[in-house]
Amino acid sequence: MELFRGVLQVSSNVLDCANDNWWCSLLDLDTSDWEPLTHTNRLMAIYLSSVASKLDFTGGPLAGCLYFFQVECNKFEEGYHIHVVIGGPGLNPRNLTVCVEGLFNNVLYHLVTENVKLKFLPGMTTKGKYFRDGEQFIENYLMKKIPLNVVWCVTNIDGYIDTCISATFRRGACHAKKPRITTAINDTSSDAGESSGTGAEVVPINGKGTKASIKFQTMVNWLCENRVFTEDKWKLVDFNQYTLLSSSHSGSFQIQSALKLAIYKATNLVPTSTFLLHTDFEQVMCIKDNKIVKLLLCQNYDPLLVGQHVLKWIDKKCGKKNTLWFYGPPSTGKTNLAMAIAKSVPVYGMVNWNNENFPFNDVAGKSLVVWDEGIIKSTIVEAAKAILGGQPTRVDQKMRGSVAVPGVPVVITSNGDITFVVSGNTTTTVHAKALKERMVKLNFTVRCSPDMGLLTEADVQQWLTWCNAQSWDHYENWAINYTFDFPGINADALHPDLQTTPIVTDTSISSSGGESSEELSESSFFNLITPGAWNTETPRSSTPIPGTSSGESFVGSSVSSEVVAASWEEAFYTPLADQFRELLVGVDYVWDGVRGLPVCCVQHINNSGGGLGLCPHCINVGAWYNGWKFREFTPDLVRCSCHVGASNPFSVLTCKKCAYLSGLQSFVDYE
């Protein structure tokens, strides 16, 4: 219960108007352990006791109030002042002054001969808010005063009823036990599990509290269970509850307090990984359809290994490797994946370069820090190293001073090398080694399909829940020695749920379409440069359209008006989706030295059954490889469908499609 406090001034003129009822009052005052009351002091004691007696049997807003009244002498002038500490279920800042003045003036009306009224001055802060710390005010100020400074005191608060007029107790050097203010009315304390005995502790014992405190605790736990940490999320989850709380000033304050406690509990008392896991495991069974899994497979990473590392990293169990760095060109899914993970945690912050003086203004008190398009300047390199390494540090905040930042996981996305430290117009690699020791780098090199869309929290929860349910043996073998570059995919260790394209070993099965391996190998490259390969206006079909089986539509021949989809256009989330990137040995293909051609994997080297003729991946890799070799010898012959018959060379030079197809990209960059 909130206890308000204030002061009533009683001048000497009021006592001059005392009538016979006041002077001749027969009210019994127990002064056995108190200084004797004489003259006007006795009048004030009678007046205070009369007010307390009337308050005990009154109704209206003052019904059931807790009160503590103490009258004292003025120091510098004649007269008295009364300290009033009062609170009840019907009292609030709006009616406090009216109720207190009405109570005291109603009693005073029958004790004076003239119409005299007292004015109540409530205790208020500099911002105009009422003090609600009556309990602390009694304990730390009023009860420490002794006679003769105190004339009289009355109260109905358990623990102070007998001690408030005990001079021996007040003169004690310290109290044996802090009295506790009963915060319930009638049977409320027993319902809430509190004891109403004298001398109990202020802090509830064994986690028990009042109905209001238990309700507030339940609200905080509900926010954490439903992953509600912002007002906007609260409105979406339970708009009715939010509206009811927002209808009053105290309810609005309760909303802010509950959200702060829920965020603190989620960031400090509960592992962050619990918010990244799905509660219903049945919804994570079809993991091969997960967008994040497809994205990681596209980027040549094992989704299981990456997911298990993310779970360790988000719980700050990776030691100094406190940072994930997604590095690569634009449109490869870096920021998409980073923001999906960030939106799944309770609360995340971002490094903001709009104000270079306070880039880490939004880092304190967060579960995760997102550093998009990161760049490190010499002025903040030491603070950056501490944050990236998960070490506690202090950062400056705008108009707030410095604030402590504990170890917080960091995810970085960038197109450039963040290990370069920028100082003015110069860059240095002095800190590169120290920065790399704090990061795990994932290279995103393959452009994503425009059909991918944004990754959602459900995708993250499905992916990480599946990873958490699998064996951690593969991850533990790598985690023994953390490396700067995250290890690429290992076909032998890939989980069976992720192997969507099994390798064909039966030599009796021919390639699709009834074509021979030689015809399919020869035509695969020409499908890459077919006139319709760059036609982006025609919608793609889920059914593959057969390409040309020979080079009839190649450069120099007439162009067919029929739009023919290339084989690489049908690829979705595979390394072959970026056909115009030069192949990397050991990443995109393995060289078969015996037969002198590239194959898709080690198992197809020197394959007696002719792996190239049976595996479609080997055919695509061979066509891709031969295409780059062809471009080296004929760099100016290949044109896109729009410029096959173009006579103006500038039209070809400015066409990005022609540049990719003909190998003119290096020439254009040079010029």
UniProtKB/Swiss-Prot annotation:
Principal localization?
host cell
Organism from which the protein derives: Human parvovirus B19 (strain HV) (HPV B19)
State the oligomer form and interacting partners.
Homooligomer; when bound to DNA. Interacts with host E2F4 and E2F5; these interactions promote the nuclear import of E2F4 and E2F5 and the G2/M block observed in host cells. Interacts with host transcription factor SP1; this interaction is important for NS1 transcriptional regulation of p21/WAF1. Interacts with host transcription factor SP3.
InterPro entries attached here?
Answer: Helicase_SF3_DNA-vir (IPR014015), NS1-Nuc (IPR014835), P-loop_NTPase (IPR027417), Parvovirus_NS1_helicase (IPR001257), PV_NS1-NUC (IPR049901)
Q: What is known of its domains?
A: In the N-terminus, the endonuclease region is involved in binding to the origin of replication on the viral DNA as well as to the overlapping viral promoter p6. In the middle, there are the ATPase and helicase activities. The C-terminus probably contains a transactivation domain.
Q: Where is this motif: RCR-2?
A: 81-83
Name this protein carries in UniProt:
Initiator protein NS1
What exactly does this protein do? Multifunctional protein essential for viral DNA replication, which cooperatively interacts with the viral DNA origin of replication and transactivates several promoters including the viral p6 promoter. Binds the origin of replication and performs an endonucleolytic nick within a conserved sequence in the viral genome, thereby initiating the rolling circle replication (RCR). Participates in the transcriptional regulation the viral p6 promoter that regulates all viral transcripts and the cellular CDN1A or IL6 promoters.
Cited PROSITE patterns = PV_NS1_NUC (PS52022), SF3_HELICASE_1 (PS51206)
Compositionally biased tracts (Polar residues): 533-548
Instruction: Tell me the residue numbers annotated for binding ATP.
Output: 328-335
